[in-house]
Each structure stands twice: as C-alpha cells, then as structure tokens.
Amino acid sequence: MARRNRGRSGAVIRGPLAPFAGDYEIQLRARGYSSRSVVCEVRYLARLSQWMENCRLNAADLNVERIDEFLGGLPRRRDGGRVCSRRGLIQILGVLDDSGVLCPQAEKPASPSEVLLASFERFLLQERAVAPSTAVVYVARARRFLDWCAPNAELGGLTANDVINAVLRVSASASPSTTKLFVSALRSFLRFSFVEGLTPNELSAAALSVPRRRRSSPPMGIDRRAADALLRSCDRRRSVGRRDYAILLVLLRLGLRAGEVGGLCLQDFDWRAGEVTVHGKGGRVHRLPLPTDVGEAIVAYLRRGRPNGAARREAFLRVVAPTGPLGTNGISRVVRCACSRAGVPMVRAHRLRHTLACQMVEVGVALPEIALVLRHSSLSSSVEYARVDIQALRAVAQPWPGGDR
C-alpha cells in the first residue's frame, strides 16, 4: 500500500488515504487550522487510513457513513468526547472529490412536491428578492401545506376550504405570530401557484388574516450603562475580543440586523468615502455613513483579528477552524456571550437595534429620521418608538372625560 512519512507530525500514513495527505494538510491550513491542529488532524487521518486498510476499503469507498463507523469504534475520552475530530476528518472527502476519486452518487429522483417547492424557492429568490433565510422558512411552510392538502403536488382541485382548514389547523396549536407567518408563506405560495397556472383560481385571499393585538409594552432597548458593559466585556487584546467589540459597536451604532451584520463583506466597506453598503431585507441595498469609532474597531479586527489567508469574503469569521462566516446565529451568539460576560440580562441582537432607536427618541429625533436610519420600508414600523418617550406622550394626552370630577 502507499506510504507517506509525515515528518512534521511524526505519523506514518499507510493505507488508501496516504497519497492525499499532502492535499489534506493544505486544505486544513487554508481553512484556518493552526500548525498544531494540522498535526493532530493528520494523525487522525493516519488512524482512519489504517482502519480502511484493515477493512480492505479503497479511497473511493469513503463517505460520511464510513467515517462515523470508524469513529463509533474508537474509545471515548473521559469527558465523553471523541479522540478524533469528526469535523476535520470529513474534510478529506472534499480532497478526494477534487481529485476525482469519489464516484458521483446517483441522486434519488425528486418527488413532484420537491420539484414544485424548488421552483417556488427560485421564484422567491429571483422574482421576489426575499432573503435566503426567509425563502427557507416559506418553503418549509409550503411543504407542510402540500403534505396536508396535495401530497402529489396536484393543485388543480384545490379549494378555498382547503386553504381555510389548513390555517385553522395551524392556529389550533400555534401562537398567533407563528400562525401569521404560516399565512404569509401560504399566500405567497398560492400566488405563485396561480401565476404558474397550477391553480385555476387565485386562492391567496382564502388564507384569512390572523388578528394580532398590538403589544402592550413599547419596544425596549438597553440603557447606556448596560451597553457600555457589553463593550467593556470584550478583551481587545485577543482576536475574538476585537471581533466581538466591532460587532457590538456595529449593532449599537448603526442599528443593523443580525443577518445584515453577518452578511457584511470586505468589498462592502468604502474606506475613502467612510461608508458601508448594507444588503437589507427584500434585496434592498443601502449606503450608510461609517462612524469613526466603528470604522476604527473594524479595521483593528481586520488587521489583528481576522484569520490570515482566509478565502472567505465575509468580514466577520469564526475564530475556531474551520473558518467561515458567522451568519445570523453567530452574531446573536456574540451578543449572548457578551451579556454573560458583562453580567447584564440576556438580550438578543435585535434589542441593540431597539437601543439605537430609543436613544434617538430620547434626544428628540423625529420619527421619519428614525425610519431613515433604521431603513424601515414603512413609517408604521417606526411609530412604535413614539411610545418610548413617556413624557412627550403625557404632554399631548387629552384629559379623560369627567376625570376632574
């Protein structure tokens, strides 16, 4: 069998994976693994290759199931963790695929429902310009509707009663907000079906609106002391601290949504003009001024925090290999961790957006200007913040009839 001596790791790789050890190491380094981690991962690869040789397996036989089988036969550490890294070993599959070793697996023919849902997703992304995360949510709701009313994706016999019953079925066990989301997705799917000629009638109106009471409490941000505590909790002597500090400052000073922060790319920053391009909801693109302190924090992270040689164009990346974009969940996790470090009540990233709006209300900024800063498509979204300034509301409140008697 092929043999390759890994002088740096001290591991001798025997078996079917030996010829690919060099490319595997290159890929690990490209994904942000440290030299020490690369040594460990190569040793894990040597154990996997030896196991495959004992099982009389070729490199083309390797897949995720084989890797899990190999890991399942290894003893666990005292803390219950694996002695080998599953995340690292799975990356050998990419090396084998790039080398043309792996045979392309025959894909199962998609069902009529999945074909229809794939077409609906393309419609959402290309025609409606919705965010990819929103498209995923809408497709999931449309899939549930099809499972109930048209398992074979035959929509010609669909009636308004079918639509109404589906909404009632969801509302019987879900919250008003969840039901409202289902109705929005269902209406979009029914409009798509009519446009494509799949239904003889436009049935979206049959998905009745869900009454939702206006929330009794005004939108709440966090006070300045808590905001300062979040920023101070970041250890800017470390890479992760510089990254988290920049993220928190972007959320607090620009009022971006978590997904918008996670989607920021290097080319979105115009350093000469002092502006940043934000890709918002509905495919809308906005150019915002970049405050000096925010720009300095981002530059400090890019120079002395962002993984060197990262091929990704997203600005904010994971610190732990394999490097990749944080995304919406990662940005929210940064906020939660900062709350835990600072000892302040746990909040989500969107509360920091509310914080900016509340601060603008406190200093007398008009609602149209708040809507402009937060990039609300409708002024009604900003009207909620009018309830934040209680003193101003008292000044314009009318006396209760007969209240002075």
State each model region's role:
Residues 1-405:
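Conserved catalytic core of the tyrosine transesterase superfamily
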